[in-house]
């Protein structure tokens, strides 16, 4: 597990009825740290989309929607093109993740 994943493992799960990014019904759970990176027991976020292909769930898997834990809150960033996490962290425009809907 790399340093970025370790930081993400510190945050709590985001368990909302609606997708915290777009407000649609949240029908899937997404592992914030991929299971393949050791995130089996890590935090998850409930998101819209079918499987890994559509909605915000698809954007997370295609590396266009990124999450970061600040130590006190989750923030997200949308990028129009797939972007490596390290590069996304350098960009401005991060927004607070909505946990109430």
Residue ranges with predicted function:
Residues 36-46, 54-101:
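Polybasic, low-complexity binding patches
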Residues 26-36:
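Short recognition patches in nucleic-acid-associated and regulatory proteins
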Residues 1-28, 48-50, 54:
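Short cysteine-rich loop/turn motifs with clustered Cys
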């Amino acid at each position: 597990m790399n340093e970025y994943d370790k930081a993400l493992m510190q945050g709590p799960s985001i368990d909302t009825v609606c997708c915290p990014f777009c407000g649609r019904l949240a029908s899937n759970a997404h592992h914030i740290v991929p299971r393949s990176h050791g995130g089996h027991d890590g935090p998850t976020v409930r998101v819209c989309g079918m499987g890994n292909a559509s909605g915000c769930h698809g954007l997370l898997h295609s590396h266009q929607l990124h999450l970061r834990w600040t130590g006190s809150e989750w923030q997200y960033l949308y990028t129009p093109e797939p972007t490596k996490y390290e590069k996304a962290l350098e960009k401005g425009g991060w927004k607070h993740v909505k946990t109430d809907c």
